[in-house]
């Protein structure tokens, strides 16, 4: 569960390393889970890349420590909170995605991120 002021790792090679959530997009929810889009600020970035500290970006949540419950009763949890930086159209800014990605992103039509992922759980 991600809320404003939550810190997230970046799970792609866009150039940002750490994000801080400043807004959860979508009707009235103050917390985000896997597949939700957030507005975030870059807190740490790799030098000489597209992002620098204090840039405002859109990102989609791909992993949370809280996890999600599936219809078959299984709960999927991850070791960290992570997001992938996206553009206005919903396409990832990076060309690679690191770590496992939850299958629930397919429900939000984020199949481009799933196709870049090394492992879909």
Curated annotation (Swiss-Prot):
Q: What is its main location?
A: plastid
Give the PANTHER family listed for this entry: 50S/60S RIBOSOMAL PROTEIN L14/L23 (PTHR11761), LARGE RIBOSOMAL SUBUNIT PROTEIN UL14M (PTHR11761:SF3)
Q: Which CDD domains does the entry link to?
A: Ribosomal_uL14 (cd00337)
Q: Which family does it belong to?
A: Belongs to the universal ribosomal protein uL14 family.
Record carries keyword Ribonucleoprotein: yes
Superkingdom in the source lineage: Eukaryota
Stretches assigned to coiled coil: none
Q: Which GO terms describe its cellular component?
A: chloroplast; cytosolic large ribosomal subunit
| Entry-linked InterPro entries | Ribosomal_uL14, Ribosomal_uL14_bac-type, Ribosomal_uL14_CS, Ribosomal_uL14_sf
- SUPFAM superfamilies membership: Ribosomal protein L14 (SSF50193)
Name this protein carries in UniProt: Large ribosomal subunit protein uL14c
Describe, as the record does, how this protein assembles with itself and its partners: Part of the 50S ribosomal subunit.
What is this protein for, i.e. what is its function?
Binds to 23S rRNA.
- Compartments, as annotated in UniProt: Plastid, Chloroplast
- Pfam name, any one: Ribosomal_L14
Listed under GO biological process in this entry are: translation
GO molecular function, a single term: structural constituent of ribosome
Keyword Chloroplast present in the record's keywords: the answer is yes
Instruction: For this UniProt record, give its keywords in alphabetical order, as a comma-separated list.
Output: Chloroplast, Plastid, Ribonucleoprotein, Ribosomal protein, RNA-binding, rRNA-binding
């Amino acid at each position: 569960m991600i809320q404003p002021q939550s810190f997230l790792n970046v799970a792609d090679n866009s150039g940002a390393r750490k994000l801080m959530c400043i807004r959860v997009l979508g009707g009235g929810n103050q917390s985000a889970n896997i597949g939700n889009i957030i507005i975030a600020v870059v807190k740490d970035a790799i030098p000489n890349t597209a992002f620098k500290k204090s840039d405002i970006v859109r990102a989609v949540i791909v992993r949370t420590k809280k996890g999600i419950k599936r219809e078959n009763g299984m709960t999927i949890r991850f070791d960290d909170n992570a997001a992938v930086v996206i553009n206005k159209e919903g396409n990832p800014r990076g060309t690679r995605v690191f770590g496992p990605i939850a299958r629930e992103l397919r429900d939000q039509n984020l199949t481009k991120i799933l196709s870049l992922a090394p492992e879909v759980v």
